[in-house]
Amino acid sequence: MAALGPKMERLSSIDAQLRMLVPGKVSEDDKLIEYDALLLDRFLDILQDLHGDDLKEMVQECYEVAAEYETKHDLQKLDELGKMITSLDPGDSIVIAKSLSHMLNLANLAEEVQIAYRRRIKLKKGDFADENSAITESDIEETLKRLVVDLKKSPAEVFDALKSQTVDLVLTAHPTQSVRRSLLQKHSRIRNCLVQLYSKDITPDDKQELDEALQREIQAAFRTDEIRRTQPTPQDEMRAGMSYFHETIWKGVPKFLRRVDTALKNIGINERVPYNAPLIQFSSWMGGDRDGNPRVTPEVTRDVCLLARMMASNLYCSQIEDLMFELSMWRCSDELRMRADVLHLSTKKDAKHYIEFWKKVPPNEPYRVILSDVRDKLYNTRERSRELLSSGHSDIPEEATLTNVEQLLEPLELCYRSLCACGDSVIADGTLLDFLRQVSTFGLSLVRLDIRQESDRHTDVLDAITTYLGIGSYREWTEERRQEWLLSELNGKRPLFGSDLPKTEEISDVLDTFHVIAELPSDNFGAYIISMATAPSDVLAVELLQRECHVKTPLRVVPLFEKLADLEAAPAALARLFSIDWYRQRINGKQEVMIGYSDSGKDAGRLSAAWQLYKAQEELIKVAKDFGVKLTMFHGRGGTVGRGGGPTHLAILSQPPDTIHGSLRVTVQGEVIEQSFGEEHLCFRTLQRFTAATLEHGMHPPNAPKPEWRALLDEMAVVATEEYRSIVFKEPRFVEYFRLATPETEYGRMNIGSRPSKRKPSGGIDSLRAIPWIFAWTQTRFHLPVWLGFGAAFKNVLQKDIRNLHMLQEMYNEWPFFRVTIDLVEMVFAKGNPGIAALYDKLLVSEELHPLGEKLRANYEETQKLLLQVAGHRDLLEGDLYLKQRLRLRDAYITTLNVCQAYTLKRIRDPDYHVALRPHLSKEIMDSTKAAADVVKLNPGSEYAPGLEDTLILTMKGIAAGLQNTG
């Protein structure tokens, strides 16, 4: 190694640098700095080996200047950092942006390992009293004990509630997962190395080998192109989503249900959760969500369903042989013996395409005889799906396959009953029970696919039909006229149109989607969701189209209400729908309604949206009760706070009383899928949190808010909406300011998802999707959509009457919904930094718009001050020291990336902005004559100067990784 320069001696240890940022350990079991320092040391050594001392020194120097800015908030440090970064040549700036982005990903991994470690320590001590984690964690065992011991529920009541509840997790491919799958897999291996390195019984040789493996994985991740060079298709998104089933969810579900059995035993229930209790269900939108995504065609939907069926049978095939090995007994019930004898006589000779049990199973192994028949059918099911997927037809007859889940469950149930009857229930409750639980959870289709479409598209189809029938234009009819016609057709029998109906491409697309639903087995599908739904006719239209396209088992139709006005009108719309006799008979006492968090937030700001969503749920439940209907709420939450995200447990427990009632559907979007299911322990924790919180909310609902709290919040919401809209929609130059002050215009280059970032190509904030709107403000660490409106609302009620402060503090302490709303905004303030937003303004915003930026930053500071007053906190996050520590450790990297991004945007947007470049720093060690210039060649088609586009995208990804709430 080269001798250390004077600068490097000051920075001899990254460990010391990290400790400078964080004032001491948070607790005895706090190893975060240790983990962080180890990963960064290894990375910096790799950087030095690959690119030389100068570049490593530059990265550390940037880090040091940024750390000084973070501790002293001296704006000159940002200028100093800017000069250092802009003097880099294109290749170097890409390598440095990539290094910082990589360091943030490593910091995330260190943090995940620390969280899991703390959890294990806590479980060993049997101690759940740690306030910080108790608020956001919910252990199923802890919840059951609390319900029985503290809340005096009887164990039988708890068991009954638990086995009848359902949590349906809906995976959606929202364009927010900004890390490539190739990297996610490497991250997973880094995480595993780190866990093993710190385990107690590790030998010196193990340690050495693990350290080598760790370095290998860190280097492999660094050498992988972080940027997606092509936009993913819906099929890519589906395959990415399905990979989580393969890797964690498939085995995670039975493992979790065993833990539930153990927790029940500990409160005195000696029964297991029945294998067919629908505790956890999975659905998906990948390949079914066509709202604003023209790339999701009927063919895509068909492919995705066949692919999921193929994957499900493949997973069962891979496990059935383990079960055949386990069930080698000869004792069995007469019922099973008779079945086995019949099968034994009818089976063919050998099956050479199997590795195990390829010879005919002897009759004295009756369970294996039964299971080998199941295996044949699973094999045929998989091969038939594979052939249909690749060529559109299959020679395997359908009767040789499994067409519904009963055909798979029935022989397994027979084995289970027989084992129990022969005194072998201990064996029955092993692998066989796990298998039965998997079949009950995943069925033959792995997940149920929801279809989502805009209501307008259905109106177009019906308009074409009524015009074709010569009875007028459906689009022009009043709501009453529409309902009358739809109901008369639904009550009648005649087909509405033939093949000669004149169709545009859009109309064909809608009808062909219904034909795909009719053609495929009904267990492939879940709900049909109508976005932008406003009236009963929107729902009836889908019912009629399902009938016209011969859907034998119609999908349940779910209206989605998302804008503020739609949420306000939703209860009345639902009441009108329930008062239609035909519809009430059709739904059989069950209805689902989806509420959208993203668009309501974009439309009115976070405070008003959160309160309106709360009230809408209360009203909708009331309407459903009046009509004797069980209502399931489907929550369309994003990963970020601006789009309704936040800790799961808190989010569920802060819902209004009576709104969950043991059935909950919730979306798991984009990057949240990786955070929830990326590892076995994360998957376990996710299933546990949802199950425990749903049970607790049902059995111990939160207090209903006092009338005076409601009145105060009503008043605040009006002021907040007014303030939010006066800036976002009414300030004439706001859109121009937004486009200049953030990287919104450049966002589309990230190739995150298959969906366009705008609903309409031109247009203002209205047409912009909620994700890029939030993403852009997150990048500049200003988070405007989250906090805007809160300050004005607080100020208004405090100026009216200072006693309102006491009431707000009482609401914060006693009302979970209000507390969660405030805490999440506080967390966003802790991640925000108006100084960084000011840098973007200084570099990118035209002079005459500077006052608008200054006004918004003053508003930010004032809102933060008022929020702390309401929460009764002196500093941000004083109640959550762990989170505070984690954020401090990341700040310096994120700041460097912010500065790099702001200056890169300046160079992209202003051709007259010239910088003095220093000579190359980076040396490719393999060939010392070659600088890092090669990385510039990865993007030959860029319309910008060399290297700028990649540097920009790398900063976006790095900041997203650092703030962990992408869009």
UniProtKB/Swiss-Prot annotation:
* Cofactor(s) for this UniProt protein: Mg(2+)
Active site residues according to the UniProt entry: 174, 602
GO molecular function of the protein, one example?
Answer: phosphoenolpyruvate carboxylase activity
Name the source's superkingdom. Answer: Eukaryota
- Where, per the database record, does this protein carry Phosphoserine? 13
Q: Which InterPro entries does the entry link to?
A: PEP_COase, PEP_COase_bac/pln-type, PEP_COase_Lys_AS, PEPCASE_His_AS, Pyrv/PenolPyrv_kinase-like_dom
Q: What is its EC number?
A: 4.1.1.31
A single GO cellular-component term on record: cytosol
Annotated localization: Cytoplasm
Which Pfam families does the UniProt entry name for this protein?
PEPcase (PF00311)
Q: Could you tell me which pathway this protein works in?
A: Photosynthesis; C3 acid pathway
Q: Catalysed reaction(s)? A: oxaloacetate + phosphate = phosphoenolpyruvate + hydrogencarbonate
Notes on activation and inhibition: By light-reversible phosphorylation.
Which keywords fit this entry according to its UniProt record?
A: Allosteric enzyme, Carbon dioxide fixation, Cytoplasm, Lyase, Magnesium, Phosphoprotein, Photosynthesis
Q: Write out the similarity annotation.
A: Belongs to the PEPCase type 1 family.
UniProt function note: Through the carboxylation of phosphoenolpyruvate (PEP) it forms oxaloacetate, a four-carbon dicarboxylic acid source for the tricarboxylic acid cycle.
Subunit structure of this chain's protein: Homotetramer.
Protein name per its UniProtKB record: Phosphoenolpyruvate carboxylase 2
Source organism per UniProt: Zea mays
Gene of this entry: PEP4
